[in-house]
Amino acid sequence: MPTTDHFSRQAALYRASRPDYPPELFSFLADVAPAGDLALDCATGNGQAALGLARHFAEVVAADLSPAQLAQRRPHPRVRYVAAIAEQLPIADRSVDLVTVAQALHWLDLPAFFAEIRRIARPGAVIAAWTYGLAQVTPAVDNVVARLYTDIVGAYWPPERALVESGYRDLPFPFEPIQAAPLSLRADWPLDRLIGYLGSWSAVQRCKDATGSDPVASVRDALAAAWGGAASRTVVWPLALRVGRAAR
């Protein structure tokens, strides 16, 4: 089954509102990869993870099926963007040191994708996939976000979202496990940035399509009251990370 595109229509919002991944994540992956020649970021979107990889690898190929997402790409001299689905990659056999999938593995055709990874991976190459769940701000803000997530747009999440909710624990991952230290995404955001992030959820877009109204607007006042008078607050997303090694 081909990969589904959930984010093209909100590509600009996605780029503007998604949090950055911690630099320690990319340092760790570079340390465990067998070499630093070529990294591949699948379902790259606008290249958010690809730029983190570019600090450590001589070349990064960043692939995505969405022309709208690639139009928002972040240029870098060591990053080459390609329009391709993750299950059919324009990459030579046994050429890649590291494969990453950031916040997207649950959308892929996993058997086809894993077969493609076995084809392109060098002996001992590393495969890493990560996801993050709901933002954590304060108990009051978190309660409003949880109400939006569950009560208001809960029916509009695709079934694959359950893999995110389990932190990818229930996702098949047929590679030799590599243990990683716990990591989190952290950002100091104003309230408007959090609201933009909530608007980038795929379920919010599906709810808009079905109802004609903006579900985030329905909780804006409650979010503002819970947020209080702070100009910005620290937002935290615990990262769920699966890392493995291909056959040597």
Tell me what each language-model feature is:
Residues S8-P19:
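Class I SAM-dependent methyltransferase Rossmann-like catalytic core
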Residues Q103:
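Short catalytic micro-motifs in class I SAM-dependent methyltransferases
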Residues L38-L40, N46-Q88:
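Class I SAM-dependent methyltransferase SAM/SAH-binding core
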Residues E87-L98:
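A short acidic, Gly/Pro-enriched loop at the edge of an enzyme's catalytic core
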Residues L108-E116:
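A short, conserved alpha-helix within the catalytic core of class I
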Residues R118, R122-A187:
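Conserved catalytic/acceptor-binding region of the Class I
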